[in-house]
Design a protein with these regions (language model features):
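A glycine- and small-residue-enriched flexible loop/hinge signal that marks low-structured segments
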Residues: 1-235
Length: 235
């Protein structure tokens, strides 16, 4: 669109440099061959440290007047070890879960939803060992009426990265709690075959048998179990 009289010094094909009233202007050249460049010198981002996550719970969610929420969902507790390498330590898991519980107990208007560590259940072949690991994890968590603990990680499709991955089950657990609240009432249990079904997952890392489910239940941990023909259920 022609809307003004521009200097011909900037026309395509003009001399590379042209003097206009004592100044030098650089002309626009015609397109040339594609430019090939290689990005270098960058670095991958790091995971947050346990201390950073602990501080974030207090800084962003402690004030009930400014942070309106019902669930504090403790996601993956993997942290940076200070040199850019991820780690999955029980001490870091305990720090993060207990800090979230402190926030919830102080607010008294929300609940913490937590899953065990990834290394406790994922790629652990023995069901009995998985049960022992989960019990050991939650044995370090503060006993509270403001927390809900489940027993596993789930394997599902990540449509944003076009791949399958393991994630903590607590996001799904919070979802079925919200659904139960919406369809029934807040005090109605979201567990069982009618209200406790996990959707959109391929498999779970730890599928506890009856003996393990009994042990988990006594330790205030809600077993997540897959039943043939029934799906995956918060039991």
């Amino acid at each position: 669109v022609y809307w003004s009289s521009h200097s011909t010094g900037t026309h395509a094909g003009a001399a590379v440099e042209k003097d206009h009233a004592g100044s030098v202007s650089v002309a626009f050249g015609r397109p040339s061959a594609p430019e090939n460049s290689s990005l270098s010198g960058g670095a991958n981002g790091r995971s947050t440290t346990a201390g950073q996550k602990q501080t974030a719970w207090s800084d962003h969610f402690a004030d009930g007047d400014t942070a309106d929420l019902s669930f504090l969902i403790v996601g993956s507790t993997r942290t940076d070890n200070g040199s850019g390498v991820d780690q999955d330590l029980l001490t870091d898991w305990t720090t993060q879960v207990n800090q979230a519980i402190l926030v919830a107990e102080a607010r008294k208007d929300c609940m913490v939803i937590a899953s065990p560590r990834r290394s406790s259940v994922v790629n652990v072949s023995n069901e009995s060992t998985q049960s022992t690991n989960v019990l050991a994890d939650f044995n370090t968590a503060t006993s509270t009426s403001f927390g809900v603990f489940d027993s596993t990680w789930v394997y599902q499709y990540d449509r944003f990265n076009d791949k399958y991955c393991w994630i903590p089950a607590n996001g799904h657990t919070a979802g079925i709690m919200a659904r139960s609240d919406l369809q029934r009432d807040a005090w109605v249990s979201p567990a069982g075959f009618s209200r406790g079904q996990y959707l959109g997952i391929t498999k779970i890392a730890f599928n506890p048998k009856q003996a393990s489910r009994d042990d988990l239940y006594r330790a205030r941990i809600n077993p997540v179990t897959t039943f043939p023909g029934q799906g995956t259920i918060l039991f």
